[in-house]
Amino acid sequence: MPPKKAPAAPQSGKKTEQKKKEKIIEDKTFGLKNKKGAKQQKFIKNVIHQVKFGQQNPRLVAQAEGEKKTKKDDKKKELLELNDLFKPVVAAQKVSKGADPKSVVCAFYKQGQCTKGDKCKFSHDLSLERKCEKRSVYVDGRDEELEKDTMENWDEKKLEEVVNKKHGEAEKIKPKTQIVCKFFLEAIENNKYGWFWVCPGGGDMCMYRHALPPGFVLKKDKKKEEKDEEISLEDLIERERAGLGLNVTRITLESFLEWKKRKRQDRIVKLEEEMEKRKADFKAGKSLGISGREVFEFRPELINDDDEEADDTDYIFDKEDSDSETADDIKDIDLSRFVLKDVDETGITVASCERFSSYVISTEKDEEKLCVASGGEMENEDQSEEQQENDLENGFVDAVPVDENLFTGEDMDELEEELYTLDLEK
């Protein structure tokens, strides 16, 4: 028998190999991962590269990684180009103020590009678009309903109802007409027609048509056309000039001044006639359209009458207030009660007359005061006795006169003797 083959070593999986590599990296870089030095970081990169890629050239490895990145970027660019080519442009939706966004179908959802899902503020119900279609004023919606309403969808009750309507007496009396309902026209002219408009002539049972005939033009559209046809002022002037003809007078400065003078005179005459007419109306008692100024122009004597009437004004006062004020007794002063009597002046000090006299502050200049202080004479030195008495009565008091002989040589000798003979107290 041939010898048995040695059992093959079990092939290790990719995960186990990766774990082994990570363990080797941790052992070799123990305590160096948190180091911020450039050398330590470079050493860690080299260890990781050797363990993961073996003894490969680091340039080739970096080049391979760069190629992988460029391939990924190229794929993304291709996808973006395809989306730009085949994706239709969708403009941002705008909703009028006060409108509910849920009543508008999302434009991105219709193109299959909305990625918001339930968070989208617009509606994802495509049936809303059919419900929100504008009603055409040239099509009666009841005609479409009648076309769709066929016998295939009827039951017995519906069939009986249709027969009665079609061949009943009321249907026979009711005339067939192509006349447009007047309420329908008024609603369109006044911009009141819409989904919730109901015909006042019977609603859906109205016998008249709720559709405009082909070629019908509304009044508001006619007004717009008329406004567009209006010509400018320059064209109107040229048109009128062309219609005058050749037999007309040319405008010069003299003819223009004559025309202006004639017009002004006509205006003055017209104003005078109107004033006379107003005056006649005022005399007749018709003062409805006459102003206050015209009243005084027609009757100037009213101005003086108004001044005279202003003096004869009667003022109304309340008698009760005057009575309440004079309710207390008022007594007059009787001078006969005051009698002169002699008073005993013993023990009473009487003030001198000079005390009751008022001293008037003189407003002399400082130079005059200096002259008086230095012994100079006053200008009004020689005053009469009558003038001095008048000054005293009026409250003017002059300076006290100085006695020049008050301190003579004899008096000074007597004072010196008294000083020597004076006993000094110790």
Swiss-Prot record:
Assigned GO CC terms: cytoplasm; nucleus
Compositional bias per record (Acidic residues), positions renumbered to this chain: 378-392
Cysteine disulfide partners in this protein: none
Cellular localization per UniProt: Cytoplasm; Nucleus
SUPFAM superfamilies the UniProt entry points to: CCCH zinc finger
Basic and acidic residues bias locations: 14-28
Region ranges (Required for interaction with DRG1): 237-261
Keyword Manganese: no
Chain ranges of zinc fingers (C3H1-type): 100-127, 175-213
Keyword Acyltransferase in annotation: no
Region ranges (Disordered): 1-28, 374-394
Coiled-coil regions listed: 219-283
One function term, GO molecular function aspect: zinc ion binding
Main subcellular location: cytoplasm
Source domain of life: Eukaryota
UniProt KW keywords: Coiled coil, Cytoplasm, Metal-binding, Nucleus, Repeat, Zinc, Zinc-finger
Similarity comment: family membership: Belongs to the ZC3H15/TMA46 family.
Quaternary data: Interacts with drg1.
Function: Protects drg1 from proteolytic degradation.
Protein name: Zinc finger CCCH domain-containing protein 15
Organism taxonomic ancestry: Eukaryota, Metazoa, Chordata, Craniata, Vertebrata
